[in-house]
């Protein structure tokens, strides 16, 4: 029976790590071309912005991505970007030499209802 102890300990640790990731919400994810397409589609379309989102930026690059499964999927893009003065400048930055800062862009997607919404754009901590 002592041979079961290491196996049971491994299972317990795996369960604990899995539970911890679920309880903490967001999970790190490798950025795919589909993720970049979703970011561009939502972030460049001002009508997809929640009315509480007042920041307007363009993004230079995605530094990392975290996702959270809710009643759809929430994407938290950690980006380098620049403030813009016009909705026409949203999306990828046309001016690659702008003065950049770090931002978090949260996008909510629910494919079965065709929902795509920018829920927040905040300076990164």
From Swiss-Prot:
GO molecular function: cysteine-type endopeptidase inhibitor activity; peptidase inhibitor activity
Family stated for the protein in its record: Belongs to the cystatin family.
Key words, A-Z: Glycoprotein, Protease inhibitor, Secreted, Signal, Thiol protease inhibitor, Virulence
Organism: Phytophthora infestans (strain T30-4)
Known role: Secreted effector that interacts with and inhibits host apoplastic pathogenesis-related papain-like cysteine proteases. Inhibition of host proteases by a pathogen extracellular protease inhibitor forms a specific type of defense-counterdefense mechanism between plants and microbial pathogens.
Main location, first listed in the record: secreted
Protein's UniProt name: Cystatin-like cysteine protease inhibitor EPIC2A
InterPro entries, sorted: Cystatin_sf
GO cellular component assignments: extracellular region
Glycosylation site positions: 45
Signal peptide as annotated in the record: 1-21
Motif Secondary area of contact: positions: 68-72
Protein location: Secreted
Site features described as Reactive site, chain residue numbers: 25
Gene (UniProt): EPIC2A
UniProt induction comment: Expression is up-regulated during infection of host tomato.
Source organism, top-level taxon: Eukaryota
